Amino acid sequence: MRVSKSLILITLSALVISFAEAYDPSPLQDFCVAIDDLKNGVFVNGKFCKDPKQAKAEDFFFSGLNQAGSTNNKVRSNVTTVNVDQIPGLNTMGISLVRIDYAPYGQNPPHTHPRATEILVLIEGTLYVGFVSSNQDNNRLFAKVLYPGDVFVFPIGMIHFQVNIGKTPAVAFAGLSSQNAGVITIADTVFGSTPPINPDILAQAFQLDVNIVEDLEAKFRN
């Protein structure tokens, strides 16, 4: 994969998000570089901001998205996040970025971003992606097969997923309309909570035998 091609696609994704109305509060200053020093900062949008006169280029910089993340895990995918924790200068900017690597037949399992809409562009490989609408919309599935250069949008708060349906690795980049979009992975949340949800509740909710629920909870707690 040519680096120049990736950078162009990343830039296009970022521009699309930046022209949209951000979900995070709009900044009232040029920038607000996040710091952990409580004595020399002003609290804005969940972070303390350093004195603007002390800001430097490194506060707005991240290096490493040219490197593939390890997919040696149960879901065979890896998400490399670039948000306000990696780039302090993103504070109050209402935008962040991720790189997603998928092994053959790997997936980014069903999850939601409670604070952001996501726009994803596929760089290489073949993905089956989709999201499910709310109960009020009868939980409709919106899904597509993506090829390199294709773009798909996941609305804020909607459960969505991506699956590599090809025999080769896949790579995607996604922009998110929040400096800290958050992520809730459905299976991990429901079956791996601390403390665990009462198995009887989940058995009734999912219409499963309680023994199956207990087995699922044991798997997701490990």
Swiss-Prot record:
The lineage of its organism: Eukaryota, Viridiplantae, Streptophyta, Embryophyta, Tracheophyta. This is Germin-like protein subfamily 1 member 13. Belongs to the germin family. The keyword Manganese applies. The keyword Hydrolase does not apply. Residues 63-214 form the Cupin type-1 domain. It comes from the Eukaryota. Glycans are attached at residue 78. PANTHER family: GERMIN-LIKE PROTEIN SUBFAMILY 3 MEMBER 3 (PTHR31238). It is found in: Secreted, Extracellular space, Apoplast. Disulfide bonds join 32-49. InterPro entries: Cupin_1 (IPR006045), Germin (IPR001929), Germin_Mn-BS (IPR019780), RmlC-like_jellyroll (IPR014710), RmlC_Cupin_sf (IPR011051). GO terms for cellular component: apoplast. The gene is GLP6. SMART domains: Cupin_1 (SM00835). May play a role in plant defense. Probably has no oxalate oxidase activity even if the active site is conserved.
